[in-house]
A protein has these predicted regions:
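A structural "domain/chain start" motif
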Residues: 19-96, 192-197
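Bacterial N-terminal signal peptides that target proteins for export
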Residues: 1-6
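Extracytoplasmic/secreted cell-surface and envelope-processing proteins
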Residues: 52-53, 99, 137-141
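Short, solvent-exposed, polar/charged sequence segments at loop or secondary-structure edges
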Residues: 84-129, 133-136
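Stable alpha-helical elements in mature extracytoplasmic
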Residues: 69, 73, 77, 111-115, ...
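Short secondary-structure boundary motifs at beta->alpha junctions and helix caps
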Residues: 62, 145-151, 155-197
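Envelope-exposed proteins and targeting segments
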Residues: 37-42, 85, 123-128, 144-151, ...
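Bacterial N-terminal signal peptides
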Residues: 8-16
């Protein structure tokens, strides 16, 4: 009986703690007057290698990672940066077609960290390179939680200098990871806009 009461109390405590939204957005800006010449930007597919092996894990609580998180976050970031209007942003289809014409994989170009080559192939002044640490849904029978944790850096393709970077980490109860990612990317770009202007 005492064991059952203990389990009930523990379950309630876990649910109460789990209902809290955790949110953190960090922006770092490293622009100087010579960086004002950056006019065109391309967002590369986010590196989602860290979450690819996490398709489904856990016994009681299942964590399901989205299989195309890298492309989804690149699309979201492209859309939000385009809405900002500060840069001319290449669409993801433009990025893909220019890279395909160069007969190389997008992931390989990003991994090589050859930003000058990316700039020449895409004909852009800067690229946004992102990495995903979490992008999924943790699910129990009576409880679900969306998780998004990623970083992004805007890198000058001529100098190799990081112009700005962002780190976002959010976890919210009963929130789909895609909806949560849209919200987080929008908030991060809004915060970036305030820091830059």
């Amino acid at each position: 009986m005492i064991r059952q009461i203990g389990l009930v109390i523990l379950s309630i405590a876990v649910l109460c703690v789990g209902c809290k939204t955790i949110s953190r957005i960090t922006i770092n800006v490293n622009l100087d007057s010579s960086d004002r010449s950056v006019k065109t930007l391309a967002v590369m597919r986010f590196d989602d290698e860290l979450i690819q092996d996490e398709a489904v894990k856990g016994l009681i609580m299942k964590t399901i990672s989205n299989p195309d998180a890298g492309e989804m976050l690149a699309d979201m970031m492209t859309d939000e940066l385009h809405r900002w209007g500060k840069y001319r942003i290449l669409s993801r289809s433009e990025v893909k077609s220019k890279i395909k014409a160069g007969d190389i994989k997008e992931e390989d170009l990003v991994k090589l960290k050859d930003y000058a080559a990316l700039g020449k192939i895409l004909k852009v002044d800067a690229v946004v390179i992102g990495k995903i640490y979490k992008f999924g849904l943790s699910d129990m029978t009576v409880y679900a939680r969306g998780n998004v944790y990623c970083t992004a850096e805007c890198i000058d393709t001529r100098k190799g200098k990081v112009l700005w970077s962002m780190e976002t980490n959010e976890s919210a109860p009963y929130k789909d990871e895609v909806d949560l990612a849209i919200k987080v990317v929008k908030e991060a770009v809004e915060k970036l806009k305030k820091e830059v202007e």
